[in-house]
Amino acid sequence: MIFYFTGTGNSLWVAKALSEALGEPLVSIADELHKEKDGWVYPVRPDEKILFVYPVHSWGPAMSVTHFISRLTLNGYTGQSVYSISTCGDECGYTDRLIGKALEKRAISLTAAYSVIMPNNYILLPGFDVDDKDVEERKLQDAPARVAEIIEAIREHGQDALYHTGSMPGLKSYWIYPLFAHLAIGSNSFRVTDACISCGLCGR
């Protein structure tokens, strides 16, 4: 089973490639979150591989993913292989450790973490911008080979080897990421007036 979260399509492309190669069904985390359940329960087979595919946001996992995991139950989980595949513009920091900790709280053990470098697409903070066209094209050309390596590693029950931590991961993932999560993608910028019609758009 492949749980995936995607914003611009990078992680969806990776998830589809993994699904086709490994024969595991896709589950959209965004779609599941919109169902507003008290929790998310899924049966897993004894031989099932469980994958989480998602983007790195400021050197940490997309918050929708950790929110989903915080209320996730895998019925029949007895230690099956669980993999994290994150897409990033350049480096992931300790995203693997953060996702592993989130899973551990649900009594799920992370087997291995992998990463795929894809075009940068975050532009809302100073110093962030999309890649130059040649860099973007190079990343897109390199991505299929990287995904193929990850598929082979999963088939061979490989451990962490195809993951790019980058420089100063502690600073980026344990200091910058929490600030980003609180200030950049929180609800502080929203306000409600009498014009609100409760359409729910602001919560999507």
Please provide the spans of the model-predicted regions:
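FMN-binding flavodoxin-like domain, especially the glycine-rich phosphate-binding loop
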Residues: 2, 8-13, 17-33, 41-54, ...
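Cysteine-centered iron-sulfur cluster-binding motifs in ferredoxin-type domains/subunits
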Residues: 190-204
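Local sequence-structure signature of Cys/Sec-based thiol-disulfide redox active-site neighborhoods
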Residues: 1-4, 192
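Short, charged alpha-helical interaction segments and adjacent helix-coil junctions
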Residues: 185-188
